Amino acid sequence: MPIKMKELPETERPYEKLEQYGAKTLTNAELLAIIIKTGTKEETAVGLAQQILKLNTAKENNLKFLMDLTVEEFMKIKGIGKVKAIQLKAVSELATRINVVENYKEK
């Protein structure tokens, strides 16, 4: 059985780490874990997030692939149900819209 988030030192928990050190100190997996909130009996939220990151078939070190994933593709991961998949898709859409605004400002 994996270690529970509550059993980790506070400095290793995503919420506490963000609060204490800022968002820039978190890994991509930790940021995704905050979005999906909870894990399963078998996997922590960070573990689920790491599985999501493994869906990157381009193997480039960026997160653009998340924007192309469908709700159904997120749900292929055990522990990612419809609600978590929709949350991830919503955040991806927000990121897309922020990027559009930023690109517009640069012109």
Give each language-model segment a name:
Residues 40, 92-94, 106:
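Alpha-helix termini
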Residues 23-24, 93-97:
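Short, compositionally biased low-complexity segments
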Residues 99-107:
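Long, charged amphipathic helices and adjacent flexible linkers at domain junctions
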Residues 44, 92, 100-101:
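Alpha-helix boundary/capping detector
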Residues 84-95:
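Structured, non-catalytic alpha/beta "coupling" segments that mediate domain-domain communication
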Residues 77:
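Acidic-histidine catalytic/liganding microenvironments
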Residues 1-73:
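Long, highly charged, low-complexity intrinsically disordered interaction regions
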